[in-house]
Amino acid sequence: MNLITLDFETYYAQDYSLTKLTTEEYIRSKKFEVIGVGVKLNDEPTTWYSGSHADVKRYLAQYDWADSALLCHNTMFDGAILAWRFDVRPKFYLDTLCMARAVHGVDAGGSLAKLAERYDIGAKGTEVVEAKGKQITGFTSSELAQYGEYCKNDVELTLKLFQILSSEFPQEELDLIDMTLRMFINPVFNVDDGLLESRLEDIKNEKYELLGGLKEKLKCETEEEVRKKLASNKQFAQVLEEHGVKPPMKESKTTGKQTFALAKNDEGFIALTSHEDPFIQQLCAVRLGTKSTIEESRIERFISVGARNKGRLPIPLKYYGAHTGRWAGSDKVNFQNLPSRDKKKKALKNAVLAPDDHIVINCDSSQIEARVLAWLAGQSDVVEQFANGDDVYSIFASKIYEREISKKDPIERFVGKTCILGLGYGTGALKLQHTLKTQPPGADLTEERCKEIVDLYRDTNDKIIKLWKDGDKLL
């Protein structure tokens, strides 16, 4: 099988770039234009080609893609351009960006420039900055040639990086990278836009029903005016003050200054949802119900993606996107956490359709983090509880409350569940207190009580604590 290392250079501008748009939006845009492409077949000299779309397509057609692996740095981008714009689909996909995340971690810096510097394999140029806002007709012949040298250098750096990273990289992981990229580049799922349009209409109707009841009280003429007043932090704070309530404040993580604590997970806002004045409770409920929700944004995104891709739904997942090695969401969507319990919100998941003669199997690993942790640490009592099918959450909750807890005690069991899933990974008292208070169904415990619970967990799960210490020593 041949190895083809490739890098596309494409038009971008202030309002049209991968920082403004998702990868899918950028490539599907009418503004999309290839300036040129650098290609290296095996160990042959790297070539640069620039021309019209038809010219580039003819140039790419000379390669035997059916017996070639494609190598890029961010193959999700270049591979999608090949497939969507030039109908080229190689036999196998390789990606040094994915490989670097697995080798160096998600926070190590995965840009080609940083990795080239790390391995001392050469320097990445800066010509791409000078190309901003230039379409192919805007380049002089000398500028285009210089841009070509920049692109060819990127191709050479990518191959050198691959040769280093692949020396001990398992084939099984390369197969996972290939599979992950194919889910995006060569999508097979279809989207049921009719189901999504219906659910989107229901959401909007529900929101306007909420808004209609507040028009007179807030002295607004339209539902849209109510929505804007409640959605704006500044205007919502003003409404609270007009009704004798001081808006809750917090320290901004970005500026360090005081700002309104009106996000749905802010403790100050959560306290307002149970305010003694029912009208304040209603204001908070309507604010939560009328602000653009994750569900609404996702539905609109699914519909627009499907429309641009002839009903198909590319699945963008980031290989080794989390510290644990798990996949992460990408392109402003995460297909790993689509709602599954709420019947109405399940529209998102139900709208993902299998192609003809196939079915979708919906599955999930139950309590996987807690199970693997107990097994890895050798916490045999907890492993045995899982093996027996015991309710591990209720068992620990029973220790906390010193009485038998079952599923008939939803709040207490919620506390036990939160502890089992969080305390095993180092959660402390303050974090536990915040999580219990802000996550539904919610439990308001003092910091001192949370400290007692943390100590109880660590005293009764000594093998897990030892695993932490052993891990620290190895690091």
Positions of PLM-derived features:
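Short active-site loop/helix that positions an aromatic residue
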Residues: 76-87, 101-103, 236-244, 366-380, ...
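Amphipathic, charged-and-aliphatic alpha-helical interface segments
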Residues: 407-426
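Conserved catalytic palm subdomain of right-hand nucleotidyl-transferase polymerases, strongest
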Residues: 6, 72-73, 94-97, 352-368, ...
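Short active-site oxyanion
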Residues: 64-70, 226, 357-361
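Cytochrome P450 catalytic domain signature, combining two hallmark sequence patches
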Residues: 90-91, 208, 245-251, 377-388
